[in-house]
């Protein structure tokens, strides 16, 4: 089994949306891949729509990703702008994609 973390860099994701994203991701991946949606720890923005919000969410994303990386084989940043992707690639020992 390949375990993939889908990291949501914002905070305050409703549980039903988390479940929806997880369900859709797992429907779209092969059977040997398991995707788990993880929300970054705060403080941080609810949505990321500006350069300020991109930077604001990066520290929480890095803290969360560093703490959980041993549980996963890869990490996907669940945000269109891929906030913090370069820093996360430096920090983690697992592949990071946007």
What is the meaning of each model-derived region?
Residues 14, 85-86:
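Glycine/Thr-rich phosphate-binding loops of Rossmann-like dinucleotide-binding domains
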Residues 31-33, 72-73, 94:
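Short, well-ordered coil/turn segments that N-cap beta-strands
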